């Protein structure tokens, strides 16, 4: 990511084969599609912890900076069901760095210019220390943009003046604290805290389609995550992995639908206050010399709260999701590996409450859904580092809270119908994958 100068996760993912960057105009979001599957169908994980937004499954990946990250991985065909539910189209996993030396430190700063003016800067710093008993890593980063530059010759009230695009600022800050304890060679226990504070504006459309320009701002796009992860080798055959987490999301939107509204700060208001609690256990057993049998149980509670005025009461929606999964990795021959996985997922509606304009409260009926998933992959290893893999999957994802409960009026005067009993979406597909190394630094 650093070598390619990718400043956020969306940009980093855009260079992965089969991944397409998708920019949203109305919400000024950067998301990706993985072989045609969108963010609702491809969950995003941070060190294996799901961080996608509970309400609609979306997440603005441009808000996640790449400084001090270890890697960003995309699972397209075969995606381990041990991670949890809703992996219909695969999964994206972002991993944080771990120190590799007794003492490490890093400091960086970059300045950006547009139209002969400084318009942005990027800075980051990190410190880490490690020993045989564990490690500590602290890092922080900020990417701030005051404005986007306008082309020469563009100077009007809608787009902006003096080379500055109106309503185009952004400010993203992130801090990470990671504490690890390694009492034995194969045991590791980590506590991680991540705080992300984001602000962004959405520049107006200034084309000729007749579309009305609007000036939306997000003074708050904040995520906070705290999680524990443990790996314990119980004996020579069994290994237990454990996970416990809380992830929160605070999102405030100010909707100014004209330049006059923007100047007078007169517009509509929307606020989300969401959180997710979850836990997981994974037990792995060495069945034969090179075979591995794993079992996993995952639990996740998603709570979405929203209101349309600063002093209004919250609408509240809560789902509880469970997943039981198993996976077997079989070394069929010296150069042939086979891996297969199954899972059974179920989701229960705990609460769905909406405050109506007339002061009444609507309580939607409880609802629940379940789904079975399975997949298999075979991989052949050639004499060199080339591999040939063939996989087939049958996976699902549960409808989001937005898909089941939204009553917002869509465009073109359509009517939204509440559908709490909406069933899981399912995808079946196969993948043929050849990794062919043409040269030490070149492959297909």
Language-model features: locations:
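Periplasmic-side early beta-strands and strand-to-turn transitions of outer-membrane beta-barrels
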Residues: 100-116, 122-219
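Transmembrane beta-strands of outer-membrane beta-barrel pores
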Residues: 109-113, 131-133, 142-146, 195-199, ...
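Repeated loop/turn-to-beta-strand initiation elements of outer-membrane beta-barrel proteins
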Residues: 103, 133-136, 185-189, 236-240, ...
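Non-catalytic regulatory/gating segments with a bias toward low-complexity or hydrophobic composition
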Residues: 13, 71-74, 92-94
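Short acidic/polar hinge/loop motifs at secondary-structure boundaries
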Residues: 21, 49-77
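Surface-exposed extracellular loop regions of Gram-negative outer-membrane beta-barrel proteins
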Residues: 199, 250, 303, 346-358, ...
């Amino acid at each position: 990511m650093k070598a390619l100068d990718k400043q956020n996760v969306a940009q980093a993912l855009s260079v992965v084969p089969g991944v397409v960057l998708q920019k949203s105009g109305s919400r000024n979001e950067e998301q990706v599609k993985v072989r045609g599957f969108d963010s609702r169908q491809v969950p995003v994980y941070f060190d294996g912890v799901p961080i996608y937004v509970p309400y609609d499954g979306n997440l603005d990946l441009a808000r996640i900076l790449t400084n001090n990250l270890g890697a960003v991985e995309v699972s397209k065909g075969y995606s381990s069901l041990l991670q949890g539910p809703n992996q219909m189209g695969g999964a994206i996993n972002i991993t944080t760095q771990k120190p590799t030396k007794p003492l490490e430190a890093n400091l960086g700063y970059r300045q950006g210019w547009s139209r002969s003016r400084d318009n942005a800067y990027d800075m980051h710093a990190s410190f880490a220390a490690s020993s045989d008993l564990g490690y500590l890593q602290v890092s922080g980063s900020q990417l701030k943009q005051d404005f986007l530059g306008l082309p020469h010759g563009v100077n009007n009230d809608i787009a902006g003046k003096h080379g500055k695009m109106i309503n185009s600022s952004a400010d993203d800050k992130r801090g990470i604290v990671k504490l690890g304890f390694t009492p034995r060679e194969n045991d590791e226990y980590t506590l991680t805290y991540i705080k992300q504070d984001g602000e962004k504006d959405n520049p107006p459309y200034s084309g000729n389609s007749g579309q009305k320009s609007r000036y939306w701002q997000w003074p708050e796009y904040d995520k906070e995550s705290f999680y524990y992860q443990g790996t314990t080798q119980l004996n020579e055959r069994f290994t237990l992995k454990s996970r416990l987490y809380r992830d929160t999301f605070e999102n405030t939107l100010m909707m100014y639908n004209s330049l006059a509204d923007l100047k007078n700060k007169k517009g509509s208001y929307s606020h989300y206050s969401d959180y997710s609690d979850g836990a997981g256990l994974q037990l792995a057993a060495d069945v034969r010399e090179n075979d591995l049998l794993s079992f996993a149980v995952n639990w996740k509670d998603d709570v979405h709260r929203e209101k349309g005025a600063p002093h209004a009461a919250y609408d509240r929606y809560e789902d509880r999701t469970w997943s039981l999964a198993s996976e077997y990795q079989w070394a069929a021959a010296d150069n042939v590996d086979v891996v297969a996985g199954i899972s059974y997922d179920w989701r229960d509606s705990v609460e769905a409450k909406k405050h109506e304009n007339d002061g009444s409260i609507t309580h939607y009926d409880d609802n629940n859904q379940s789904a079975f998933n399975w997949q298999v992959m075979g991989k052949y290893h050639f004499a060199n580092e080339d591999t040939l893999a063939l996989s087939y999957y049958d996976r699902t994802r549960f409808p989001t809270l937005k898909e089941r409960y939204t009553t917002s009026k869509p465009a073109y005067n359509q009517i939204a119908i509440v559908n709490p009993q909406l069933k899981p979406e399912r995808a079946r597909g196969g993948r043929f994958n050849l990794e062919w190394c043409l040269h030490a630094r070149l492959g297909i």
